[in-house]
Amino acid sequence: GNGDAVIGINPATDNVEQTIKLLKLMDDVIQKYEIPTQSCVLTHVTNTIKTKEKGAPVDLVFQSIGGTQATNSSFGVDLKILKEAHEAGLSLNRGTVGNNVMYFETGQGSSLSANANFGLDKQTCEARAYAVAKKFDPLLVNTVVGFIGPEYLFDGKEITRAGLEDHFCGKLLGLPMGCDICYTNHADADQNDMDNLLTLLGVAGCNFIMGIPGSDD
């Protein structure tokens, strides 16, 4: 069901105080109803470190990552910052996930859109991002497969191919790999394409999917 692995909020602002309010809101619900899950506000990792320092109930530390140093720099992170965030998450000893306190999002095309792919193809860059993720023992690694738009994944067929490629490479690396099955409104794709990809990933043994209404993430 929805929320088995994490209940997440994509915030409208990176304001630290607002992030703390959202974390406390979700924690109150989880504690009240004794839900065996984790919460996460999908804010920048440096903000999560700040909320932790202020005593916020942080279960999972979120960050978007890429497969080259330049891509990660465009996201405002490097391996040192991710290591600091990982240690901060471990120090809280919360949730039900042991030492798996990181939640990473990836997606084909991010390195190309940042002009940080150094001539590599989208899938090679994506697989390299999974190697970054694996270093930090994540609970979740999530490819947001269609978010990049038709400039990089043109239509439903390309989004479907990318989703299956990402799932395959995640499995090869032994990651807790999942998929946010989604598409942009200006891509040559529709809800049927997303439902087809959902079915294919289910048959392929995908660990989890993001339950977004209308696949409109």
Locate the predicted segments by residue.
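Anaerobic metallocofactor- and corrinoid-dependent redox/one-carbon enzyme cores
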Residues: G1-D217
